[in-house]
Amino acid sequence: MSETVERHEFGAEVGRLLDLVVHALYSDREIFLRELVANAADATDRRRFEALTNEALALPSDARVLIAPDKAARTLTISDAGIGMSKEDLAQNLGTIARSGTRAFSQALGERAAEGGEDQRPSLIGQFGVGFYSAFMVADRVTVTSRRAGSEEAWTWASDGKGSYTLEPASREQPGTDIVLHMKEDADEYLESYRLDHVVRKWADNIAVPIAIRDAEGKEEAANRGTALWRKPKSEITEEQYKEFYRTVSHGFDEPWATLHWRAEGALEFTGLLFVPSMKPFMPMEDDRRSKVRLHVRRMFITDEAELLPNWLRFVHGVVDTDDLPLNVSREMLQSTPTLQKIRRAVTTRVINELSSRSKNTEKAEEYQKFFENFGPVLKEGIYEDFERRAEIAPLLRFRSSTEGGWTSLPEYVARMKPEQEAIYYLVADDVEALKNSAQLEGFRARRVEVLLLSDHVDAFWPEQLGKFEDKPLRSVTQGSADLAKLKPEGETAEAAPALDTLVAALKLALEPDVSDVRTTDRLVDSAVVLATSGMGPDLQMQRLLRRAGRGFGGSAPILEINPRHALIRSLNERAEAGEDLKAEAGTLLDLARVQDGDTPRDPVAFARAVAAALAGTAAKPAGSA
C-alpha cells in the first residue's frame, strides 16, 4: 500500500478528557479492561444485529472476545470479530469525544424494534469514544487495527494519548478489531493471566459474548460464564440455580430466606434478582453500612456501590440490571442520575412489600421471627434514618414484651392496650434479662400494662424518631407514668402511703445537683427507689450511651423516685423526722437506683463501703431480731 501515514490532532475536548480519565475519572485502574471488553462485546452484538438484514455480515461460529497478554513484548491485546471500524469510524470514534456511533445505532435499533420486536435488540454497552480512553491508565501507547464488516480495507489508529494520533493502512484477515496496549512499567499485573481472569469474572462474567484469555503457551481458557441468570424467565430457573447464584453474590453458605425475582416494565425498565439471607453474616453488619446490591447495565457489572437499597436493607444481596442507564464518562457517578434514583425507590418498595407480606403470614410467624432475630437491629435503623419510610417499616418490627411470652408487633400491642391507656410504653436496656427484672416495670406489671422490652444497640435512638404509631405516642417508662394514675393495681389494698415531706426535702438537699428532683411514686412495688427523667429529653438509656461516647448530656439531671410503702424508705423518713443527717444514705440510695438501671455508682468505692457497712450491721443483729 502506498498511502502515507496521516497525523491528526485530537479535538480540543479529547485532550482534556484524556487527562481526566487517566488521573481523576476512574477509582480503580482495572476498569480499563471492563471498558475495552464492553466495547468488544458491543461491536460483536452490532455485527450480529446488522447480519439480520445482511447475511454477508454473519458472525463466525467461534466469535468471541480474546484477551492475549505478551510479557516479552509487554503488550496486552484485546481482539473481537465484531462490526469493526472504517478509517472514518476510527477518526470519528477515537479522535473526537462522544462519537462512538452508539447514538446513531440506537436510532436504527429503535426502528428495528418497532418492526421486529424486542427479541432483535442487541446489548449495547456505553459510548466507545469515552471508555476507550481508559486504556491510557495502563498503557503508554495504544494501537487499534480494525476492518469494517463488508469492507476489504483495514486501518490502524495509534496514539500515545498526548495530543495527536496517526492513521495508516493495515491488513486484517477478517472483520473485527485488535486493540494493542503497550503497557506502562507499573502495569505488569495486567500481563498475568490469573489477574486478567479475575478482572473479567468480576466485571463481565454475565456478558453473553464469550470471553477467552490466551496464556503464554497459546492455550485459551474461557473467562466468563456468559449467562445472566436474572435475564431468564423464572419458570426456567430451578431452586438449586437460585441457591447457587445467591451463594455467588453473597459469599455465604446458607440458603436464601426469601428470593425476589421480577421484571419492571413501563416508563422504567429493569430486572431485579434479590435475596434475603437465612443467617447472619460472620462479620458484623456495622463494619460496612452500605448496600452491596450489584448494578448491571445490559448484563455488564458496573458497581456494587450504587447504593441501590438504603443502609437499613444492607443485608439484602443480589443484582439489578437495566437498559435505561447510559454508560458515559463517569460510571462511578451514576448515583446522581434521576433514572437510578427511580430504580432505588422501586427496588426498596419491592423489598418492603415482600417483608410486609411475610410479616403478616401468621402460618409462618416463626420463620419471620427468625428473620427478625437475624436482621431486626438493621431494619430498625430505617426508623431513625428514613423519614419517608418510617410508617412502612414500623409494622415490620418485632419486640419482646413484659406480658407476652414470645415476640409481638406494634399493631398487636395497640390491639391489646387498656381503654384508659394513652401511650405505647417501652423500656431500653442492654439485655432482655435485665429488662425483665427492672424496677422500672413494677408499677406497670401491677396494673397489667404491657411494656415493650428493647435491648438492641439501636433501640435508644429510633422510638423518639418514630414518635407515634396509629396515633399512640411511644413513651419510655423512664420518662414518667401519666397513665398509671388512671389505672389501679390489681388487688390493691386501701393502705394509704405515709407523708414523706421531711425525707423528700432532706434528700433533695443532700443530692443536689446530681438529681433535679426527689418525689414519691406509686409505680414501685418491691423496690425502694428508681430513676426517671422529666419526659422532655432523652430517656435514661440514651443518656447513658451519650456519656459512654464521651459526649455528655446537657439536659437536666434525673429524678429520684422513692417508694413510700417500702420499709427502707419508712425507716429513713423516721430518722429524717428525728433530725438525723442522711447525706451518706442519700448518696447510697442514688447509687442503688443507678445500679438497678444497669449504670455504675458515682463512686464505686464509696458505694461498696456503704453496702459492706449495711451488711455488717445486719450480721451484728441477734438471730431472729427484727
From Swiss-Prot:
Record carries keyword ATP-binding: yes
Region feature (B): 332-544
Subcellular location: Cytoplasm
Gene Ontology CC: cytoplasm
Location of region: A: 1-331
Keyword terms: ATP-binding, Chaperone, Cytoplasm, Nucleotide-binding, Stress response
Region feature C, mapped onto this chain: 545-626
Tree of life domain: Bacteria
GO molecular function, a single term: ATP hydrolysis activity
Protein purpose: Molecular chaperone. Has ATPase activity.
NCBIfam families listed in its UniProt record: PRK05218.1
Annotated family: Belongs to the heat shock protein 90 family.
PANTHER family found in the cross-reference section: HEAT SHOCK PROTEIN 90 FAMILY MEMBER
Quaternary structure and partners: Homodimer.
HAMAP family, A to Z: HSP90 (MF_00505)
Protein name per UniProt: Chaperone protein HtpG
